[in-house]
């Protein structure tokens, strides 16, 4: 007779679950309160979301040491803590953008804010597990919320974008589920560490099922990180989303996705599957190069920023190619530096949101011509947007430059000199399309003379967020050393 297996409830460990549980409790509270009292303003929901995020941040910072719980499915280590901090801070910076002067449909309904918190909980699950099933659960929670948030913009293009994202996301989920099945079939485990041990001990690195699992999981991750050739959904989805959500999508989901990729690809390389590194090398080069080339020919600034985010993802992927301690530190540092500049760029697009007067190409919301001669109409806007463009181009002394410098330094230490040169060449290409917007703002004649059209969506909340983004972008060199030490401590503690 088979022995009956008993589950030890002490393994649940509410402390490990507390970041995700608390976020879901806050989201449920919004749903209950919103259903009972329907006249609450978006100010209440935004402030409540920020409080929820900072409570969660406090819980995260309270962790001390490695913790493996929930029947070995939840992992709290340095990698998960630092990624949770980035996700929570980025979320806290983006949610106030809902407090624009114009009241858009999605920001007037309480479901938006509940879905936003549920989405964050999904990202936290993704980065806090070494178990493929829990990662898949977090991936689907966050993705389903994100599809809905995009559609809530209540525009034809938004619904189209949500459907496209849903279709691509469903394909990605299918690939991920197939990968889980393949790995379980070959190793009898869905735990990343145990899969790696089984592949190494049983010499399964040439096993057909394992190879298929690697292909499926690489494809799923490629979709989520918008790596070439899995990038085609990005420009249309960004264009159909409102600017704050597009900016959020360019950072937080990718941070969560890169943590999953870091854990999985490090395991596969360590278990003797050497071709993974070569595959990542090729994809990184293609993603950087082709995305930059496609960004050159864009006529809409938001679409340009979409391809720009793909190119930056290709740059960060180089850290996974090196797979060294320094490169892993550079991965986190790069996303923090990129956060400020990209937050600022998309915030400025949200400031310039104006549907009332259209005197440019009606196919696009943010064509380059919209910003023509802005230095003569609204000098402060032109200067601030110029700072963000220069920063994204990787020009010193602004934030992204320091991220690239640390990453390139780690690649050179790992003897990836050619890859470092490719990053530099692509950075030079990117300068063109970032400076193109600056040329329109500073050297072209204005099309619209009324500055109120450009600032009709401005609010105090937007000014504060833009101010934070400017400060983080311009003064990054002052705190970059402290951030690097902070990241290095957590990455070292995780053994990466």
From Swiss-Prot:
UniProt-listed InterPro entries: NADH-Q_OxRdtase_suN/2 (IPR010096), ND/Mrp_TM (IPR001750)
GO molecular function, one term: quinone binding
Classification via NCBIfam families: NDH_I_N, PRK05777.2-2
GO biological process, one term: ATP synthesis coupled electron transport
Highest taxon in the source lineage: Bacteria
Subunit structure: NDH-1 is composed of 14 different subunits. Subunits NuoA, H, J, K, L, M, N constitute the membrane sector of the complex.
Main location: membrane
Transmembrane segments: 16-36, 46-66, 79-99, 116-136, 166-186, 208-228, 245-267, 278-298, 304-324, 331-351, 382-402, 422-442, 464-484
CC per GO annotation: plasma membrane
Listed name of the protein: NADH-quinone oxidoreductase subunit N
Compartments (UniProt record): Cell inner membrane
PANTHER family per the UniProt record, alphabetical: NADH DEHYDROGENASE (PTHR22773)
